Amino acid sequence: MNQQKLTHYDILIKPITTEKTMLDREKRKYVFEVNVLSNKALVKNAVESLFNVKVEKVNISLVKPKPKRRGRFEGKTRRWKKAVVTLKEGYTIKELEGQQ
């Protein structure tokens, strides 16, 4: 996929809900798995348009594949990209607040 053809729904794959990310939501930080081809500007536009919020900043990191083994079969997990989105003061994503 080319970057120009990515829609907002293609950029944000799913929210990451762990104990750590749930605690970060109190600090207005939301964590998403995003498309590997996306960048900070695309993630910011996608979050702002899909959830009707204002984004203060976006931090992105590539998560490296981990070696896994099941019996005699060896492999690796897939590589993926994680985005930590910090919202401006007074904004929350209500759709994600109920998840636990």
From Swiss-Prot:
Superkingdom in the source lineage: Bacteria
The UniProt record lists the keyword Protein transport: no
Gene3D superfamilies named among the record's database cross-references: 3.30.70.330
Transmembrane segments: none
GO terms under cellular component: ribonucleoprotein complex; ribosome
InterPro entries per UniProt: Nucleotide-bd_a/b_plait_sf, Ribosomal_uL23-like, Ribosomal_uL23/eL15/eS24_sf, Ribosomal_uL23_CS
Family assignment from sequence similarity: Belongs to the universal ribosomal protein uL23 family.
Protein's UniProt name: Large ribosomal subunit protein uL23
GN (gene name): rplW
